[in-house]
Each structure stands twice: as C-alpha cells, then as structure tokens.
Amino acid sequence: MANPILKLGLPKGSLEDPTIDLFDRAGWKVRKHPRNYFPDINDPEITARLCRVQEIPLYIQDGVLDLGLTGKDWVKETKADVVVVSDLIYSKVSNKPARWVLAVADDSPYQKPEDLAGKRIATELMGVCTEYFKERNIPVNINYSWGATEAKVVEGLADAIVEVTETETSIRAHDLRVIDEVLVTNTVLIANAAAMQDPEKRRKIEQIDLLLQGALRAESLVCLKMNAPAAKLDAVLALLPSLNSPTVAPLQNGEWLSLETVVSTGIVRDLIPQLREAGAEGILEYALNKVI
C-alpha cells in the first residue's frame, strides 16, 4: 500500500529562500518554478506549495495542508487550531526571534503606549494589536496596513505603527523610535491535528522536524580534527569542549593520537591557535550539515 502524500506549505516571500536553504541542508532539494507556486521536491512522499505566511495557519487548520512553516505571530493572529510541532529559530536576516514593536516618529512627544490614546495606529497584525491596546485600556483607532507600514507615520497617515523587525534598521531609517514591544515571534513548524493522528503522516512530520532541527543546530557548530603527541594529550584535551567528550584514537605511531570534537563556530578563531600552541598539529576544520 502506498504511503500517504504529505501536503507541505512553504512560506513565500522573505522567508522563502532561507526556508528552501534549510530544507536543502536537511536533505530535501526544493526546486522552484518561475510560473507557478508548486515547487518540486526530491521526496515522493511530499508535495509542496508556496503560500503566504499569513495564510498557512488556516490552510493547516482546515486540512488544505498537512504541515507548514509560518510565524508564531500569524498563528496567534489567525487563532488557528493547529499543532505546533516545534520552534525553528531562523529568519531572513538572522537566527534570532523577530519582534513586533510599537514605534512612533523620533521627534514626536509620545513616550509610552498610553500617550497614544485616541490616536491612529497602522499595522498588518490587526488582531494582536487590538488585544494589546485593549489589555491596557488604551482607546486607539487601528487601521490595516497593506504594506510599507514604516512610511505611514512619515506620510502623516498614522501616529504610530506596530511592525515586525529583526534589527530595527528599517525602523531607524524612517526616523522612527520604538516605545514598546508588542510580541516576540519566530518561525514555527505547524501541523494539522488530523495529520498528526495518521501514523504515516506523523512519521513523516517527525522525520522532517528532526532533520530541520538538526540542520539549524549544525549552523552554529563545526568539527575539528587534529593530531597530538601522547605526551601533550592532557594539555590539548583541556582546551576542547564537545557535545559529549572528544574522540581520541591512537595512530599507528604509538606516540601520536588523533582527536576529533564538535565546537561552537564562535570560539574557533581563538581555539585553533591555542591548540597549536598546546602541541596539536594537522588541525582540520569542517562544516556540519546536521547535528542530531
């Protein structure tokens, strides 16, 4: 009996290329077509389609898709009844969560949310924004923004905006100032509840989740391999962190040992000179595709 086909929703737009790259590192080659939104994927158990992140949660809820990647913000905004399989911390700019912030003109008198009572707010995240001001008992006029939200204040179309940002670069470029954080968000892998009850679909969902998580984890790690004299082993080992402990194996020359370990990319540039000074030789550094 043929395995069920999993219907996968991939985000279109700013997350599109980072997501396709992540799937590539996880083992799935996704090839886009210039004239449609149905990319090929090198797995007969999966059919993929590109969708707007705003639409994916409801497509998952309604069973149009079995599995998809979207923002935690859009799951909250749509109130979609979906299973959050895992958090996947990656984005178009960094591997950090993004923030929806309340921002005003840099030269405006507004210093806190309460100062905006009776004012006009522009945002794409209408539901979350409405809840934010309602919880604080601040009466405001919230208008939907169809894009270029940062420009609304500059153009005099709004007194403040609620917009998503990773680095605040665009916020500052429009002479805006953040006065509060509305929501922290990141990419999530979400599934249809019925699909999670189907054994074959669940198996495939868990496989995808495992390998995507492994690919993300590998981004911040590298493998180091080196040789060291047995007499200097302790000095070299003292410098080596690892997920568990370094692998040590004897070489044919009994006076030398081979060592292998996984370390954070952030310490490599300092670690390699220290290892060399401690007596290690033939030091190799190589990237990892997945760490499970």
Language-model segments: residues:
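Signature of uroporphyrinogen-III synthase
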Residues: 58, 101-103
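Short, structured active-site "lid" loops
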Residues: 47-66
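Small-molecule-sensing regulatory modules
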Residues: 2-45, 50, 70-86, 90-99, ...
